[in-house]
């Protein structure tokens, strides 16, 4: 009987540990997942060394809709980084939950449906910022400069590899 109970407890612990390992960290302010992606709401945003106006401005993000990855939270401030890993603290009012991505590969095809054999609508150059739509396992629907299509997720920065969107 003791052995059976021990086996059951070990099994429960193993299952629970797996779920805890898969759980993503949550922000202490918003309770939203960390990391997560947001975009620049403003045309410009000061990037500071720390989470307050008294901290030095290290640089300025100057691209509206640019996707950024949130890696931390403190009060009204979000620690973010861009696709090059550069970042710092930005006031939350300069950020939007509207999702955008950056095309990473030059002449990336926008296809009529998910799949490498689907017809090509248009091509996007590397560095193009696109509005993110739905995502399947390996493909995401995007809109860039009025052109819509499906792009391989691996060609985009601003979406998690396991992320699915309706």
Question: Where are each of the predicted segments found?
Answer:
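SH3-family beta-barrel domains
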Residues: 22-49, 60-64, 71-74, 78-86, ...
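Intrinsically disordered, low-complexity polar regions and short flexible loop motifs
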Residues: 52
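Positively charged n-region of N-terminal signal peptides that target proteins for export
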Residues: 1-7
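Polybasic, low-complexity, intrinsically disordered segments
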Residues: 15-23
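Bacterial N-terminal signal peptides
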Residues: 7-16
């Amino acid at each position: 009987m003791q052995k059976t109970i021990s086996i059951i407890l070990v099994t429960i612990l193993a299952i629970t540990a797996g779920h805890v390992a898969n759980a993503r960290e949550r922000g202490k302010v918003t309770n939203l997942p960390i990391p997560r992606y947001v975009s620049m709401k403003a045309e410009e945003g000061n990037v500071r060394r720390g989470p307050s106006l008294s901290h030095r401005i290290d640089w300025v993000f100057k691209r509206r809709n640019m996707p950024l990855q949130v890696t931390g939270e403190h009060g009204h401030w979000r620690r973010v980084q861009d696709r090059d890993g550069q970042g710092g603290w930005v006031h939350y009012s300069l950020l939007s939950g509207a999702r955008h991505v950056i095309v990473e590969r030059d002449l990336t095809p926008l296809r009529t449906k998910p799949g490498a054999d689907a017809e090509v609508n248009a091509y996007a150059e590397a560095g193009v910022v696109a509005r993110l739509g739905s995502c399947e396992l390996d493909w995401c629907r995007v809109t860039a400069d009025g052109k819509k299509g499906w792009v391989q997720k691996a060609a985009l920065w601003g979406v998690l590899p396991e992320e699915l969107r309706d």
